[in-house]
């Protein structure tokens, strides 16, 4: 039996090995990376199974902690039962004892004298905003005090009429009259007048009192009505005394302290009195008595007259019936001096350094001869035709035509490194006749040497040495100028030259400028007082006025002196663009007789 069992086991092993050999080799399953290069799918599954076990343990611990806390709270409540009962019993006993011994409240003493105690005011009702939907802003003008009393006595058919009672009439101008007929009372009917501010807050005793017994007829319309028309009617009032039949008169005089002046100012009188028109219509204010009385029978009737262009037309005719005037009241003319006007304030843009320190010292008007008018107007016309490609920012304050320049600093030196000549400058065009004054004077012996070292105050940057030498050569042959403050002597000796007999002095060369404009020098027209030196052709360009005088035979102007660059740079009129390098010069300080300045 044992042999058979071992044989069977041997056969099984052989069969199994044959079956394994007959199976094809299995291909490996590709691994899926959850995190590429760090975590594959097998590791991810292992982590998930471990996390599930931790969640189960956490739930068990949370349930255990909850049960322990509930048991501990029950023990705490059991221990606090006795102290809580004792505290509640104590509070109940104290409350019962306080009820047995109540204290009386006496209240506040001297409430009337205490400023902190007072009755609350009634809150104001909410007003509708003017910006609400459907609302229109309305300005409510207060009604006059005296007029409101008469509104109640009038008939409902004429709501716009109001009476001028005796309280509004002058006390001194009243004259008693003996009449058996009902007295006529003047009534003023203003067409639409929102408010009569003249009679506002007036007392019966001190209203419209005319001092010195001087009266004048004055129509007093409302301020808010531009062209009111007043109609005066007569109303039978037998209950009123005869003293009410008189003329409403006001005195238009400037007198402080009067009772009427407190209610009617001079500005109100100005608006009330019609202004004279262009045809000469004037309102004749009569300062004497204006009571035009006419006795018909035994009745005294008053006449209120308002002046018109043809004469005073009576508004109130004799009789008891209402009369209307044949001429309308002259309307109030507009005063041009009181019309609103545009308030123009020029704004100055300061583009020149050190201008705020001495703003009035640079641009100072000097008298100019009448013969320069034509050349100056021509130069201005040419200045307006400047080429559009030249971007120049002109300041907002105008340069005067005959302005005298004074150096704005204590020592104006040329610093080309800081302000090199270039286009696009923010400095304005120079006006014709714009001159520069010399501050420092040099002895005459300096004029012989052409070296740039002659200008110790000029700061020449690197690269400008050649130009400095050329300027020195030009400066060597410069013309002498008279000192400041000396005018030409009017005699036969100096009549031709126009200079004084004193030894002249020259300007100090501290302001040489090398300027490269983009224009053709042949097509350039210089304004009077400006000259240019063309380095390429070695030619000095003079203004057109000087050239014309030279052709006619008049003596030419002396060679011009170099300008200063402390404030502005020379500008010329251009027509075409081209690369050239001329130099700009200006006339000397004193006016040359034939230079047109």
UniProtKB/Swiss-Prot annotation:
Residues 557-568 have a biased composition (Polar residues). Keywords: Phosphoprotein. Residues 175-186 have a biased composition (Low complexity). Residues 1-32, 171-192, 302-335, 549-569 are annotated as: Disordered. The modification Phosphoserine is found at residues 237, 241. Residues 1-23 have a biased composition (Basic and acidic residues). It holds the Pfam family DUF4639. Coiled coil: none annotated. It comes from the Eukaryota. This is Uncharacterized protein C2orf81 homolog. The lineage of its organism: Eukaryota, Metazoa, Chordata, Craniata, Vertebrata.
